[in-house]
């Protein structure tokens, strides 16, 4: 699962793959009732992927569990899962993304096609979607919606007016999950690294049109070609918007962005929280980043009275500010014109949205726009349909067992000093875990959504989100502000604050079934949740205290002991060689593999706690212990091309799924459950099993 800490990769598009055998579940017909609530007209069928694995034929009972547990658990599924040529890999997580994508599409389109209460969530969601589907209205308006802002850009005549305009673009589009902003700086409101009581504005570098700073400065043929294509794209957009000399303007824009990129911090700095923690007072901007008229900038940004900031990449702020000082107003104005059109391309005529590659599928583009603009409105409707209160309660009960189990594990550790144990237990007690969806939703009642005004809807929504985030600067820190939306399959660990979140869309079969087998739930979703919990207490989690503040709480001896024990696991991982010429690099995947094992151990303890001394139930010829480990192995199944597997081994911090399932070989209970003995290929002598948590 994802735990971006303070930086994260951008999410990819949902794949749509009908050919895999488990995509057979029926979808409910959705309607909007008289109260404006989306409901299922037909009963939703049981999930296509059963958590009672023996019924599906996914296993291969001809394989001995102790020799190859992954193929014992998944051999049947692997045999019938053919990877289409257009895909490089496919797994259960991808299936959940597909499923959620279809569910979100259906509920948004249902909201758009049925009468609903004015001002209700269904009306806002449906009308936002409808406005993007109203191509006639969008084409008729042309570029008129941009006229006022284009006039403002044209009127920029000095550093002060340029700085003031740049301040208006400081929006809240970056956060713990989204590291990129298409504006010169990005804003995230969150607690400070050393202050858990006050929300602060975190400023991030932004404003580049290409994905990475290296795309601008790397001399490789691929980046040279990419820059040429980007310059041609800039020219095409400007020409469509009616600007003469578009090729010359495009060259100037690329030159400006290249100068900005040279000041950007490299991506490698994102992994070093101490490089991100740069508290600046308001006066520091004038002293450390001269050039920008910061008084005008922050006044326009709504931050005139804000005394404290966190600057994540000081070199970028200093470099961009210096570029404002240079006499290049026309270059800046062309840059702002291009990015204005680019930013709103999806709400502009088709010629522009097509050039911006946002019009391949109008309906899907409208769904994506709606989901992005009104995430918690869509999320609330999604939760009503697909994650009922009973499922949330059952998942929360499981989390309670996981916390009890982890508490006992910490108390019994031999390598952690007594003082560090005390701090670990305090951190565990303070850990906030959000399940499914927020207890308090964003209130959209003041936001007007108009059915025939796509551009206006975007602008009003951006203003709404900006004001909502600025208001948080005057509010106490809320550790359970959700960084992920219910309809997005995923899990997020936020070290600061000390909180973790698991969306409704990830807590679906086959990971979790609110009506399904407890042993399977604990072995799959339980192990995943415990995996994330363990990261709060590992070598990286050790630098954040119970309140999410920076501060190491391990002793030097604790660190040495942890590294000695985890080093043994790295050696075990080094032995995994899917190809004769390529083996896993144990150190590269160590952190995630330690968490996999910790999650499995804690989840097993929690499953035992859930039984409350009662006898296990037999299902499909398997007892609870067997189903627990089977579910763990089945969550890692994946079909993958050789090239994709080689790329994963070369650069990913996670083991290939086949080897992630082999964490069972370090768990004593697995040996008992499947009668694994010396001579079996996965057998590890008890004294050599990895024992960290």
Which stretches of residues belong to each language-model region?
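Intrinsically disordered, low-complexity linker/terminal regions across diverse proteins
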Residues: 47, 259, 288-291, 314, ...
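Active-site-surrounding "flap" and adjacent substrate/cofactor-binding loops of secreted or lumenal enzymes
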Residues: 47-48, 61-137
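Short, solvent-exposed loop/turn elements at domain surfaces
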Residues: 77-81, 210-211, 510
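N-terminal secretory signal peptides that target proteins for export/translocation
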Residues: 1-17
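Noncatalytic, helix-rich "gating/capping" subdomain that lines the substrate-entry/channel surface
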Residues: 111-401
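Gram-negative bacterial Sec-dependent N-terminal signal peptides
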Residues: 12, 16-35
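Short, Gly/Pro- and small/polar-rich lid/capping loops
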Residues: 42-57
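Hydrophobic/aromatic-rich, well-ordered segments within soluble, folded domains that form packed cores
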Residues: 59-79, 216-239, 590, 600-602
């Amino acid at each position: 699962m994802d735990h971006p800490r303070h930086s994260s990769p951008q999410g990819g598009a949902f794949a749509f793959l009908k050919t895999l055998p488990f995509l057979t579940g029926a979808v409910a017909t959705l309607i909007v009732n008289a109260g404006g609530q989306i409901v299922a007209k037909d009963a939703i069928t049981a999930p296509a992927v059963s958590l009672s694995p023996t019924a599906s034929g996914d296993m291969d009972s001809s394989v001995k569990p102790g020799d190859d547990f992954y193929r014992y658990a998944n051999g049947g599924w692997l045999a019938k899962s053919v990877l289409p040529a257009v895909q490089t890999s496919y797994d259960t997580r991808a299936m959940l993304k597909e499923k959620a994508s279809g569910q979100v599409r259906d509920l948004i389109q249902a909201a758009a096609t049925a009468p609903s209460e004015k001002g209700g969530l269904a009306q806002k969601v449906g009308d936002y979607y409808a406005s993007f589907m109203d191509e006639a209205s969008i084409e008729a308006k042309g570029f008129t919606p941009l006229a006022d802002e284009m006039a403002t850009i044209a009127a920029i005549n000095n550093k002060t007016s340029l700085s003031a305009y740049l301040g208006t673009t400081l929006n809240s589009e970056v956060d713990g999950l989204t590291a990129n902003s298409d504006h010169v700086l990005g804003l995230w409101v969150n607690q400070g690294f050393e202050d858990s009581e006050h929300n602060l504005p975190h400023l991030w570098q932004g404003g580049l049109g290409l994905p990475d700073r290296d795309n601008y400065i790397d001399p490789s043929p691929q980046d040279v070609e990419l820059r040429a294509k980007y310059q041609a794209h800039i020219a095409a957009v400007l020409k469509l918007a009616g600007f003469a000399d578009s090729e010359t303007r495009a060259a100037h824009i690329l030159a400006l962005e290249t100068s900005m990129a040279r000041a950007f911090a490299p991506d490698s700095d994102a992994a070093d929280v101490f490089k991100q923690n740069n508290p600046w007072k308001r006066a520091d901007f004038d002293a450390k980043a001269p050039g920008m008229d910061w008084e005008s900038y922050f006044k326009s940004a709504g931050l005139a009275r804000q005394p404290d900031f966190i600057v994540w990449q000081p070199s970028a702020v200093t470099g961009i500010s210096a570029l404002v000082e240079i006499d290049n107003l026309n270059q800046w104005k062309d840059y702002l014109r291009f990015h204005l059109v680019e930013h709103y391309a999806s709400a502009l005529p088709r010629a522009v949205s097509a050039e911006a590659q946002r019009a391949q599928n109008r309906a899907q583009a409208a769904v994506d726009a709606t989901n992005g603009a009104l995430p918690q409105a869509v999320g609330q409707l999604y939760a009503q349909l697909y994650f009922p209160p009973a499922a949330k309660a059952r998942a929360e009960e499981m989390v309670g067992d996981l916390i009890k189990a982890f508490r006992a594990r910490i108390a019994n550790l031999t390598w952690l000093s007594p003082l560090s144990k005390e701090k670990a237990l305090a951190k565990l007690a303070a850990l906030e875990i959000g399940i499914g969806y927020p207890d308090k939703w964003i209130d959209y009642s003041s936001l007007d959504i108009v059915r025939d005004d796509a551009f206006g809807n975007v602008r009003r929504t951006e203003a709404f989100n900006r004001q909502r985030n600025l208001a948080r600067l005057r509010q106490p820190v809320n550790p359970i502000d959700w960084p992920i939306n219910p309809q997005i399959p995923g899990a997020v660990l936020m070290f600061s604050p000390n909180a973790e979140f698991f969306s409704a869309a990830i807590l679906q079969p086959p990971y979790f079934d609110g009506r399904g087998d407890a042993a399977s739930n604990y072995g799959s979703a339980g192990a995943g949740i415990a995996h994330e919990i363990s990261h709060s207490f590992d070598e990286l989690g050790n630098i954040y205290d119970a309140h999410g503040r920076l501060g190491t709480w391990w002793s030097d001896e604790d660190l040495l002991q942890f590294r000695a024990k985890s080093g043994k696991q790295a050696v075990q991982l080094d032995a995994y060689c899917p190809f004769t010429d390529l083996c896993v690099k144990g150190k590269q995947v160590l952190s995630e593999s330690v968490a996999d094992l910790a999650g499995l151990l804690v989840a097993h303890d929690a499953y035992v706690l859930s039984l409350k001394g009662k006898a296990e139930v037999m299902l499909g010829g398997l007892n609870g212990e067997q189903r627990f480990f089977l579910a763990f192995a089945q969550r890692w199944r994946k079909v993958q091309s050789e090239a994709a597997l080689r790329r994963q081994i070369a650069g990913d911090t996670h083991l290939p799924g086949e080897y992630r399932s082999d964490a069972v070989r370090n768990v004593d209970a697995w040996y008992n459950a499947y009668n694994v003995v010396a001579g079996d290929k996965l057998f590890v002598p008890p004294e050599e099993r990895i024992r960290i948590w």
